[in-house]
Amino acid sequence: MRIVEISHDECKDLLNRVSVGRLACSLENQPYVIPICFVYEPDHLYVFSTLGQKIKWMRQNPKVCLQADQVGDRSNWSSVVLNGTFVELREAGEKEHARERLAKFSDWWQTPLAERRERISDLSIEPIFFRIDIASMSGLRGISEAE
């Protein structure tokens, strides 16, 4: 297997094809990584969540990293890593834009709400839309030697 860099355009193409990534945030030198569903738009990712550890941490330290990939097998894969800034959407128009973008996936709202309901007895769940403003992005691809 060879590992090669992929272009910026290939990174964007991958982010358009996948909808799940691993979001890393940190607070007081402690990292926290969780899977999230997202939708890509040039220079941004849009995400829907509920109030929990990641939101609390990102409100205090908005610098984040996200990794997303598409894996065929151990020798055929593509991966993108991006660094960016968490921006909580507060204006109605911004939230509606994020909701419209996320609605391309029929189940975009289910995971955060289902997870939250299982962890709390108080069902007063605060929906939160946020954006990750992308500062940098790079990617790699694993290629089988047979190719």
Language model features with spans:
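Extreme N-terminal tail/first-helix region
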Residues: 1-17
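Charged, gly/pro-rich active-site loop segments
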Residues: 2, 74-147
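A generic secondary-structure signal marking the coil-to-beta-strand transition
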Residues: 11, 19, 62, 78, ...
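Short beta-strand segments
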Residues: 18-50, 66-67
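Short, structured patches in soluble enzyme cores that scaffold and shape functional sites
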Residues: 27, 68-70, 133-136
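Short acidic (Asp/Glu) patches
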Residues: 49-52, 64-69, 109-118
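Active-site-adjacent structural patch at catalytic or cofactor/ligand-binding sites
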Residues: 50, 60-69, 78-87
